Amino acid sequence: RHAFPAPRQPSAHAGLFDLLHMGAAASHARTKTLETAMGPILFRSFCPPSFVERLRPDSGLHSFARLPEREHHLLLDIAKSPDCALTLAYTPAGEIVGQVTIAPADEWWEDIEDLYEVAVEVSVNWRRATIARTLLSFALELDALEDMIFFAIGLSWHWNAKDLGISLHHYRALIAHLFGTQGFVEYPLTDPDVSKERTNVPLARIGKRIDKHVANQFLSRLLSPDSFGRF
């Protein structure tokens, strides 16, 4: 499975920022600072390519692309897409230690409106610095939050539980709790092949203003036997 979206044709919309902020006259980028036991961490939303280029990846940022350098290229591609929103956590020295990507769902979901996939990662070197929850919460501070459906597919083969000295089941519980703090709900596995690995987990947050028909359409697709087979 591609952890990050493949390059797409430019959206007919002005950009994902305008959709997520309902046309509000706000700055495209917000910033925040978190003091941790390992030092201060800076957060920035809607990171432009020029900003990503000036940063470098921490050595522990490699869950999705295997190598930090490759992941940096992926993050740069995401920043270049008007359809995606990239939020980064980084040190004052310019090392990327975490990221949250919000991207339109792929073609398999194309008839479902206002649907976005969320991917989050924190460097293994910074996992005990309480960054993930703050980063995800910061990325989801959106005016249109209740008008959107967000989902995340937790696949255990992306997880580096051994680096943390914990089991996959413990890691799964951490993932579910992390997203649960932002209103995501865990759903059951239905694909017979993927469900053999009980640590995989689908999570979703359905906005309060989403039409019931759209919500039911999404859940029917998410829980279909073909859903996880795509990944």
Each predicted region: which residue ranges?
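Conserved GNAT-fold acetyl-CoA-binding loop/helix
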Residues: 52-74
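A conserved beta-strand-loop-helix scaffold within acyl/acetyltransferase catalytic domains
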Residues: 66-115, 120
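Short, histidine-centered active-site or binding-site loop motifs used for metal coordination
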Residues: 119-121, 155-156
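Conserved acetyl-CoA-binding loop-helix of GNAT-fold acetyltransferases
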Residues: 122, 128-144
